Amino acid sequence: TGYEEAAAQGLMAGINAALKVKNKKQFILDRSTSYIGVMIDDLISKGVSEPYRMFTSRAEYRLTLRADNADQRLTCLGIDLDLIKDERKNSFLEKKKNILSVKTMLDKNNLTPNEAKKHNIKIAMDGVKRSCMEVIGQRNVNMAKIRQIFSNIPDRGKSIDNQVEIDAHYMGYLQRQSKDISSFKKDELVIIPETIKYETLSGLSNEVKSKLKKVKPRTLGQAIRIDGV
């Protein structure tokens, strides 16, 4: 709608104003962590001529930035910033513990292709053992089916099962995307000094120097994402 721009910037401004008063480190959400991070980075590195509208297509790591895992990505950060009330904090920590307990047992239990076939689960007949977490990632396999085979997998409720199943479906894609995120974070760790004089750097066109001076990127990664750089 465009209202996301004002709301998100207001939230981040409020958080960082409070941190500055307390002489604490600035809080930054990056592109791999949240859509707020994507938006702020776009506003800085690309600029806008109209209200910014948040589309999933703007995020290169959108498989990680899903609605179903927003609490897992961001609530811990909110707890660290003392933004989360105790009731919600305790509820989140309990959910996190339950998800971990289920995933741990799924990783410990394995199925060979022949064993899976006996239970009408279709996986590649390649002789490779797969963890139950991997098997759930297959189409038409859910937690109820796996519990019929392995009784030691805890039942923490439907909502936990749903989250585990979603995570399992995305697992293979996320493992590949994590390599891209690692590369992204590596560039984000290279801080550009605020005192840098771009006009003295050789090998850069006047246009690029002008854009860098205007945007004042904080990191190498941010500089790379400026249009035309």
Q: Where do the language-model regions lie?
A:
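Short FAD-binding loop at a beta-strand-to-alpha-helix junction that anchors the flavin cofactor
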Residues: 1-2
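Mid-to-C-terminal Rossmann-like scaffold of FAD/NAD(P)H-dependent oxidoreductases
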Residues: 23-77, 81-86, 90
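Extended, charge-enriched "interface" segments that sit outside catalytic cores
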Residues: 58, 70, 75-80, 84-229
